[in-house]
């Protein structure tokens, strides 16, 4: 199963969403996504691989955060 979420939001709203995800990770071991009335829950183990990627190109920039387990 794969669920992708891509929306245009204000920088502050993006920061708030990242904070929500960080809070979920630090307070438990689930990440919850809700879309169209459906709730998706991913169990996250105590140890994960964290990948941070920053890319600058002529047309803009991209910053990615990826957790795998």
What annotation goes with each model-predicted range?
Residues 6-14:
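Short, basic/low-complexity N-terminal boundary segments at the transition from targeting/disordered tails
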Residues 12, 30-32:
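Charged, well-structured alpha/beta interaction segments
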Residues 17-18, 43:
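Proteins with a high burden of low-complexity, intrinsically disordered sequence enriched in S/T/G/P/A and R
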């Amino acid at each position: 199963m794969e669920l992708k979420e891509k929306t245009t939001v204000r920088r502050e709203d993006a920061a708030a969403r990242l904070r929500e995800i960080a809070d979920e990770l630090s307070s438990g071991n689930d990440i919850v996504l809700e879309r169209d009335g459906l709730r998706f829950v991913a169990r996250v183990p105590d140890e994960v691989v964290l990948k941070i990627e920053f890319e600058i190109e002529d047309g803009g920039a991209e910053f990615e955060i990826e957790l795998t387990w």
